[in-house]
């Protein structure tokens, strides 16, 4: 079991502890629960889905990397597939606050990059900030997404984001988590291919500046992240953050990164290169390459 879960596990009810401990045994537990694992936990505890998600929030919050604020926020995104995806806020010392990943973004990006096609609900241990409410409005589940907060009645996103501005106002039809393929030829070694594939499935309807990042770890594991734009621009999630989020959720630390590749267009309206390099160097990675999409 990864050390980050040890203290959080002791806060759970005894029956839930006993049921989930075997699932957490792998130090690289992927911070997600398959539908059958959710059913197993429900059977062991007698909890319905909503109550179980609340009970598991301490484990999601344990995934946070709040190196600046030391304020851990946890989120659990529930996919239409039945899978549950953990998320936690991420802050990067030596970078800028603009590189921060919020817990809701973490859980949603986690689900998206794992192939989930839509979300039913998200459970969070603190009220979503305006940034996250706007980020969620980019999803194909839209304002119908159910938000679950401790001690409050569940509401759809539209309750928390009235008179919302979103993709429809800009006549965007393809939404975040919809299937997308930008069709760039995939070639090169495994890491280069992963970066191009990540760019191919990114969501960039506003700038038309597709990009993807792939990170290779010392043990050969590869994590990739896709760019996720937002109608309000600022809540956009860069591709590096998507990859770093997966890396962290899977129990790895930044020093494990031995090589990184960014895939983007040379003539794109928005360029990720400088911000990607600056953040990776702040995390100790010096071997950074760029492949141009053709």
UniProtKB/Swiss-Prot annotation:
The record's annotation in Pfam families points to:
dCMP_cyt_deam_1, dCMP_cyt_deam_2
Enzyme nomenclature, EC number = 3.5.4.5
- The UniProt entry annotates the active site at 104 (proton donor)
Give the binding site residues for substrate: 89-91
User: Which residue ranges does the record assign to the CMP/dCMP-type deaminase domain?
Assistant: 48-168, 186-294
Report a single Gene Ontology molecular function: zinc ion binding
Q: Name one GO biological process term.
A: cytidine deamination
Cofactor(s) needed, names only, are: Zn(2+)
Residue positions binding Zn(2+) = 102, 129, 132
State the UniProt keywords alphabetically.
Answer: Hydrolase, Metal-binding, Zinc
User: How is its cofactor bound, per UniProt?
Assistant: Binds 1 zinc ion.
Q: Name one GO cellular component term.
A: cytosol
User: Domain of life here?
Assistant: Bacteria
The yes or no answer to whether the keyword Transmembrane helix is present is: no
Q: What does this protein do?
A: This enzyme scavenges exogenous and endogenous cytidine and 2'-deoxycytidine for UMP synthesis.
What the entry lists under NCBIfam families is as follows:
cyt_deam_dimer, PRK09027.1
Q: Which family does it belong to?
A: Belongs to the cytidine and deoxycytidylate deaminase family.
What subunit structure does UniProt give?
Homodimer.
The protein's name is Cytidine deaminase
In the UniProt record, the gene name given for this protein reads cdd
């Amino acid at each position: 079991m990864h050390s980050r879960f040890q203290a959080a596990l002791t806060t759970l009810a005894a029956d839930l502890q006993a049921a989930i401990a075997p699932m957490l045994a792998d130090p690289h537990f992927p911070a997600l629960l398959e539908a059958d694992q959710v059913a197993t936990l429900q059977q062991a505890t007698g909890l319905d889905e909503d109550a179980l998600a609340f009970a598991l929030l301490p484990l999601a919050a344990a995934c946070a990397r709040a190196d600046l604020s030391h304020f851990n926020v946890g989120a659990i995104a529930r996919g239409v597939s039945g899978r549950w995806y953990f998320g936690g806020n991420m802050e990067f010392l030596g970078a800028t606050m603009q590189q921060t990943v919020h817990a809701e973004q973490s859980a949603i990006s986690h689900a998206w990059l794992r192939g989930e096609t839509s979300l039913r609900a998200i459970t969070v241990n603190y009220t979503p900030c305006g940034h996250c409410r706007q980020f969620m409005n980019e999803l194909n589940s839209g304002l119908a997404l159910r938000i679950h907060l401790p001690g409050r009645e569940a509401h759809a996103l539209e309750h928390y984001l009235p008179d919302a501005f979103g993709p429809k106002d800009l006549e965007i039809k393809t939404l975040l988590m919809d299937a997308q393929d930008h069709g760039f030829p995939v070639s090169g070694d495994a890491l280069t291919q992963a970066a191009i594939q990540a760019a191919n499935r990114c969501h960039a309807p506003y700038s038309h500046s597709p990009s993807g990042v792939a990170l290779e770890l010392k043990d050969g594991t590869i994590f990739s992240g896709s760019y996720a734009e937002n109608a309000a621009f600022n809540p956009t999630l860069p591709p590096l953050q998507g990859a770093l989020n997966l890396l962290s959720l899977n129990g790895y630390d930044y020093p494990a990164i031995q090589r990184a590749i960014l895939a983007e267009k040379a003539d794109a309206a928005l360029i990720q290169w400088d911000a990607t390099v600056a953040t990776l160097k702040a995390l100790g990675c010096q071997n950074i390459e760029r492949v141009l999409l053709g």
